[in-house]
């Protein structure tokens, strides 16, 4: 009996709950319908609103309007969000440069962008170009940037060179007032003309350009491309000169955009060249984007070695880097074309992103949208310190390859000028030959830059500063590395500010296995 009553009570309770829920749903539907018919709001506490006192605030008006006007909002928000997603996705490498994706594949194109960073400097420079301001483009690179292997009439400046391809494309998009200036004596931006300055030097790396970059392109350069990875050894000492080079570029008053280009070669002891190992971390520290032909092509070439013949240059029959008629150190026409298209695609990607950013912001104020930032106060290659600040560096260079500050002795006995193609030196081959230079320093550092090789028969020289012969350095031109390139040495780093004399003497002793003595000086540098 009791169980029966309990079951009946439970059934009534469930019925009452269902009825209550249904009644509340019906009431809500009626309220919404009431509002849609424009019959005013309904006060849940006291019945229908008294419309005779419209100027008296009603606490239920807000609730009614929320139902009436805010209900469609989520649909509109979703639509807007989807549109923005489409815009963002439209700024993709394969959309702005589909032909590159077709050639190397989307994955390899993405790999080519080794480091993107904020791109604020690059976007600032592109924003100036889009406003119609003239621009200068400079290159700090080695023999690849000079176009060795293109086998054209003008490898360095001709239209087949990858840097010239980039410049011509930019000049077409953002033409100056007159004809573009291809390696003029100096900047012609004052005349409204765009300028191309290929400052590349064969057989040098970051240690040369960290001190001598002012000799090879104007200080009001807007776009700077670095291409020294192939010429760098896989040693930690490569990092600091590369860092000093970056700081020197980024500290220019013209606020240049700097892009680090990393090439590819198959003629060295390591499959991946030293710069591809030693440069990326430093570039990231300074927010400098890096584009890598090595990353783009290496997977394809490892799977299909015959592609080396497509992307690299025809080699000299007696060349040390020539294998089966192909120069495995210098890319050819197709390699230059691909590298240029990768860079152009990356620049297009930035301009696409700029369109989106400026549309969303409703303006194109450069300083607000693309803040410049500042150089890190410490060196990436230095030790952490709570308060230390790296001083601004103003390097000075006397170079055999410079038209501005040519390396010229104040005293000379047995040394002479000599050049091979675009490389210039002061050389001596008779032991006992002496030469003296004068150079100024502000922070007390003087460096000598000289060539090293395993095959040219290089000997030894002794160099010192002022009369401090006891602090002389013995420099060996010979080494067993597969590079014929320049290397720097710190002659002194403790000198007082002012002008100092640097002396060098060719020695009888030599490290060359063949007993030869020739020694080549490229430049003298100071800070």
Task: Explain the meaning of each model-derived region.
Residues 11-21, 30, 85-108, 314-527:
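Conserved catalytic region of serine esterases and O-acyltransferases that act on ester linkages
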Residues 90-199, 214-218, 446-456, 464, ...:
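Serine-esterase "nucleophile elbow" of acetyl-processing enzymes
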Residues 121, 257-262, 274-322, 337-356:
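Extracellular serine-dependent O-acyl
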Residues 117-124, 205-217, 240-248, 274-278:
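Alpha-helical scaffolding within the catalytic cores
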Residues 227-231, 246-277:
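Active-site segments of SGNH/GDSL-like serine hydrolases
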Residues 138, 145-146, 150, 206-239:
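Oxyanion-hole/transition-state-stabilizing segment in secreted/luminal serine hydrolases
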Residues 2-51:
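N-terminal signal-anchor transmembrane helix specifying type II single-pass membrane topology
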Residues 48-91:
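Fungal extracellular Ser/Thr-rich, low-complexity intrinsically disordered regions
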């Amino acid at each position: 009996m009791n169980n029966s009553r309990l079951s009946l009570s439970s059934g009534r309770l469930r019925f009452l709950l269902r009825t209550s829920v249904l009644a509340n749903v019906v009431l809500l539907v009626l309220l919404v319908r009431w509002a849609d018919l424009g019959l005013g709001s309904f006060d849940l506490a006291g019945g229908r609103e008294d419309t005779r006192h419209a100027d008296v605030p009603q606490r239920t008006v807000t609730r009614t309007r929320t139902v009436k006007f805010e209900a469609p909002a989520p649909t509109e928000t979703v639509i807007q969000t989807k549109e923005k997603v489409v815009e963002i996705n439209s700024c993709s490498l394969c959309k702005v440069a589909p032909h590159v994706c077709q050639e190397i594949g989307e994955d390899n194109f993405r790999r080519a962008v080794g480091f993107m960073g904020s791109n604020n400097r690059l976007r600032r420079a592109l924003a100036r170009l889009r406003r119609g301001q003239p621009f200068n483009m400079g290159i700090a690179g080695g023999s690849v940037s000079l176009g060795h292997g293109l086998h054209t009439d003008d490898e360095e400046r001709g239209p087949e060179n990858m840097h010239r391809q980039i410049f011509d494309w930019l000049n077409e998009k953002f033409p100056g007032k007159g004809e573009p200036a291809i390696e003029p004596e100096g900047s012609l931006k004052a005349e409204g003309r765009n300028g191309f300055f290929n400052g590349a030097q064969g057989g040098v790396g970051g240690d040369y350009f960290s001190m001598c970059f002012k000799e090879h392109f104007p200080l009001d350069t807007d776009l700077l491309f670095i291409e020294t990875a192939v010429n760098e050894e896989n040693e930690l000492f490569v990092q600091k000169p590369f860092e000093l080079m970056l700081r020197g570029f980024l500290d220019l008053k013209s606020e240049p955009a700097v892009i680090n280009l990393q090439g590819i070669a198959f003629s060295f002891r390591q499959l991946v060249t030293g710069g591809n190992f030693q440069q990326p971390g430093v570039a990231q520290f300074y927010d400098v984007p890096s584009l890598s032909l090595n990353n783009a092509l290496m997977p394809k070439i490892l799977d299909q070695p015959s592609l080396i013949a497509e992307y690299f240059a025809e080699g000299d029959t007696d060349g040390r880097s020539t294998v089966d008629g192909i120069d495995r150190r210098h890319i050819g026409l197709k390699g230059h074309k691909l590298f240029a298209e990768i860079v152009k695609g990356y620049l297009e990607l930035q301009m696409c992103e700029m369109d989106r950013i400026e549309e969303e912001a409703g303006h194109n104020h450069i300083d607000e949208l693309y803040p410049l930032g500042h150089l890190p106060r410490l060196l990436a290659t230095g030790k952490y310190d709570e308060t230390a600040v790296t001083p601004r560096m103003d390097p000075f260079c006397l170079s055999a390859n410079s038209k501005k500050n040519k390396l010229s002795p104040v005293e000379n006995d047995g040394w002479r000028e000599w050049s091979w193609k675009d490389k210039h030196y002061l050389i001596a081959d008779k032991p006992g030959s002496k030469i003296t230079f004068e150079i100024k320093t502000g922070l007390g550092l003087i460096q000598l830059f000289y060539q090293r090789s395993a095959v040219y028969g290089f000997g030894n020289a002794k160099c010192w500063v002022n009369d401090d012969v006891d602090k002389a350095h013995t420099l060996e031109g010979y080494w067993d590395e597969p590079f014929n390139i320049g290397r720097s040495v710190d002659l002194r780093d403790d000198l007082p500010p002012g002008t100092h004399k640097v002396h060098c003497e060719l020695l009888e002793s030599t490290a060359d296995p063949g007993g030869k003595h020739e020694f080549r000086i490229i430049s003298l540098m100071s800070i």
